[in-house]
């Protein structure tokens, strides 16, 4: 493996550690002053190994910051009505401040209807239409965790956003669209590319800030990026037991000023942001 310049790597684990330390201190204060322990319930439907792993990682993070965490592990063949009932019971519980619906759900279930059923005040992932609408008018509270984590990383590394050209490759509700809104809220000029964009390279070569979230291994090559750009790689592809991002990291890092690795980049900050959300929701009940 060729040597890479470590000063160019955006260390997601270090940022996550800092965020978790802030959350832990605030959780301890909330317990001490108000007697409230923030609680997160993760709804996991079926036996998908990746989903199980993600829930485990989130539970471990809860343990590190003092948040109570539990699983609602539901069978693969659960009906939509039963899922909505499970969500409704969590909405009513006073000890649960954050609800997380681990996606994807089995194909027979309606994901959007299930997400819409979560109390917006307990929407730990920030996917509820109410919270998405708040984001569009510039109110950033419970917003999708990955874009929020990327904004935190930009701030931590002192990257100027205002007046910069930010390009997002991928237009999902989880990353692309909310990322665009958050960057616009900070006065960036934003371009969104997707599978129907005719010449993606034309956009990526002009990006001061590039966020890539497609799940296509090494989609972004060295000749597609601007000298001195800042790049966030959100994609994950598993192949022969190895994990790859959407960005050809080892070559792109030669040209960029900052790049996130995969793993160890965006992922840890996303989970730390989730912890922030559970804390925020608990603080509002105090």
From Swiss-Prot:
GO terms for biological process: L-histidine biosynthetic process; methionine biosynthetic process; purine nucleotide biosynthetic process; tetrahydrofolate interconversion. InterPro entries: Aminoacid_DH-like_N_sf, NAD(P)-bd_dom_sf, THF_DH/CycHdrlase, THF_DH/CycHdrlase_cat_dom, THF_DH/CycHdrlase_NAD-bd_dom. CDD domains: NAD_bind_m-THF_DH_Cyclohyd. Pfam families: THF_DHG_CYH (PF00763), THF_DHG_CYH_C (PF02882). It catalyses: (6R)-5,10-methylene-5,6,7,8-tetrahydrofolate + NADP(+) = (6R)-5,10-methenyltetrahydrofolate + NADPH; (6R)-5,10-methenyltetrahydrofolate + H2O = (6R)-10-formyltetrahydrofolate + H(+). Keywords: Amino-acid biosynthesis, Histidine biosynthesis, Hydrolase, Methionine biosynthesis, Multifunctional enzyme, NADP, One-carbon metabolism, Oxidoreductase, Purine biosynthesis. NADP(+) binds at residues 170-172, 236. Transmembrane segments: none annotated. GO terms for cellular component: cytosol. GO terms for molecular function: methenyltetrahydrofolate cyclohydrolase activity; methylenetetrahydrofolate dehydrogenase (NADP+) activity. Disulfide bonds: none annotated. Pathway: One-carbon metabolism; tetrahydrofolate interconversion. It comes from the Archaea. Its EC number is 1.5.1.5, 3.5.4.9. HAMAP family: THF_DHG_CYH. Catalyzes the oxidation of 5,10-methylenetetrahydrofolate to 5,10-methenyltetrahydrofolate and then the hydrolysis of 5,10-methenyltetrahydrofolate to 10-formyltetrahydrofolate. NCBIfam families: PRK14176.1. Homodimer. Belongs to the tetrahydrofolate dehydrogenase/cyclohydrolase family. This is Bifunctional protein FolD. It comes from Methanococcoides burtonii (strain DSM 6242 / NBRC 107633 / OCM 468 / ACE-M).
């Amino acid at each position: 493996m060729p040597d890479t310049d470590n000063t160019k790597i955006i260390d997601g684990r270090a940022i996550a550690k800092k965020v978790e330390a802030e959350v832990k201190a605030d959780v301890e204060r909330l317990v001490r002053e108000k007697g409230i322990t923030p609680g997160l319930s993760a709804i996991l439907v079926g036996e998908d190994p990746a989903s199980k792993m993600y829930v485990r990682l989130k539970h471990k993070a809860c343990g590190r910051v003092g948040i109570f965490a539990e699983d609602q592990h539901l069978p693969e063949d659960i009906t939509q009505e039963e899922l909505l009932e499970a969500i409704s019971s969590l909405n009513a519980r006073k000890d649960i401040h954050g609800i997380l619906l681990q996606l994807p759900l089995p194909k027979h279930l309606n994901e959007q209807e299930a997400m819409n059923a979560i109390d917006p005040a307990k929407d730990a992932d920030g996917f509820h239409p109410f919270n998405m609408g708040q984001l569009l008018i510039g109110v950033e509270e419970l917003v999708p965790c990955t874009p929020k984590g990327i904004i935190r990383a930009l701030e931590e590394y002192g990257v100027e956003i205002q007046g910069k050209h930010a390009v997002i490759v991928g237009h999902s509700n989880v990353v692309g669209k909310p990322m665009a809104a958050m960057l616009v809220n900070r006065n960036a000029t934003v371009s969104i590319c997707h599978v129907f964009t005719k010449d993606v390279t034309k956009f990526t070569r002009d990006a001061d800030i590039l966020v890539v979230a497609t799940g296509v291994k090494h989609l972004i090559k060295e000749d597609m990026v601007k000298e001195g750009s800042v790049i966030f790689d959100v994609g994950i592809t598993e192949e022969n037991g190895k994990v790859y991002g959407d960005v050809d990291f080892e070559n792109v890092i030669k040209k960029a000023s900052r790049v996130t690795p995969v793993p160890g980049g965006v992922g840890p900050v996303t989970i730390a942001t989730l912890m922030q959300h559970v804390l925020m929701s608990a603080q509002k009940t105090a």
